[in-house]
Amino acid sequence: MSAYTVSRLALDAGVSVHIVRDYLLRGLLRPVACTTGGYGLFDDTALQRLRFVRAAFEAGIGLDALARLCRALDAADGDGASAQLAVLRQLVERRREALASLEMQLAAMPTEPAQHAESLP
């Protein structure tokens, strides 16, 4: 097992230490052990979760929804985790639809400057 400090976890996930600490406060991450000095230690599973949470957040999934999923996973609540995963899948599908609509709108946008001023008296 690899043991990560907050700073090493942040570095390996490509995020700031502040993000890791924020996720800890929100319950998105939990240390698996503590040093004698009281510092949290994390394992590879925590690194995977951090990468997942960050990717989901970057994709537009809110931290509250992600926290509900993480709480269900941490509580070994299979039904709760399944329900939260279903919610996340719905959010992802809505994002896909919104992005597809935006893509169509972008494709329809004119690339030349508008000639409105010339037609005014």
Swiss-Prot record:
It holds the Pfam family MerR_1. Coiled coil: none annotated. The keyword Transcription applies. GO terms for molecular function: DNA binding; DNA-binding transcription factor activity. Keywords: DNA-binding, Mercuric resistance, Plasmid, Transcription, Transcription regulation. NCBIfam families: coreg_MerD (NF033783), MerD (TIGR02054). CDD domains: HTH_MerD. Residues 3-72 form the HTH merR-type domain. Residues 6-25 bind DNA. The keyword Cell cycle does not apply. Transmembrane segments: none annotated. This is HTH-type transcriptional regulator MerD. The gene is merD. GO terms for biological process: negative regulation of DNA-templated transcription; response to mercury ion.
